[in-house]
Regions:
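Conserved ABC ATPase signature
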Residues: 4-8, 12
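A short, proline-enriched helix->beta-strand linker immediately N-terminal to the Walker B motif
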Residues: 23-27
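A short, surface-exposed alpha-helical micro-motif characterized by mixed small hydrophobic
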Residues: 71-73
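Charged, flexible cofactor/metal-binding loops and thiol motifs
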Residues: 91-159
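Conserved small/polar residues in nucleotide/adenosyl-binding loops
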Residues: 162-168
């Protein structure tokens, strides 16, 4: 039964968009919040579809999201941005369990936890102090590897980040 685009549900529209994108057999796709407007009940099926297609078609995604739970599910590495600049990159579980940059710590602390009795680490970050560092040193900070391919932005302008490459599946 043929339908017009306005007659499709959000999930159907997203599947059509995915099909239109992948019909060209790309090796790399930028996905900017592809599931944010979907109902929670449909979101997981779209993410599973994307992961299965990535594996079957050998395509890599740069998945842009504000939702760290989605990033954890979709990506093997996460790059955190502050004021439009990448401040930390690491394997997903490494970054979520051992954040180093003050903004990453604050971002992780802001994730709501459904169980109020769950005791989690809360990071206290002074955003005025963080903003003053950005103003003082600029926002183009070099990245350094602190081990396990965990990169953080630094204010030491003598460090080069030309060796830094993004992995095949990364969330920003």
């Amino acid at each position: 039964m043929p339908r017009y685009p306005h007659e499709l549900s959000g999930g159907q529209r997203q599947r059509v968009s995915i099909a239109r994108t992948l019909i060209m057999k790309p090796k790399f796709v930028v996905c900017d919040e592809p599931t944010s407007m979907l109902d929670v009940s449909i979101r997981i099926s779209i993410m599973d579809l994307m992961l299965n297609l990535a594996k079957d078609l050998e395509v890599s995604y740069l998945y842009i999201t504000h939702d760290l739970a989605v990033a954890r599910y979709m990506c093997n590495r996460i790059a955190v941005m502050f004021n439009g600049k990448i401040v930390e990159i690491a394997e997903t579980e490494e970054l979520l369990s051992n954040p180093v940059h003050p903004y990453t710590k604050r971002l992780i602390s802001s994730i709501p936890v459904p169980d109020p009795s769950y005791d989690r680490k809360v990071y206290d970050v002074n955003f005025d102090e963080l903003d003053s560092l950005i103003e003082k040193y600029g926002s183009d900070k070099p990245m350094i590897d602190i081990g396990n391919e965990h990169y953080i932005a630094t204010h030491d302008v003598t460090v080069s980040y030309t060796h830094l490459t993004l992995p095949t599946s990364c969330c920003v």
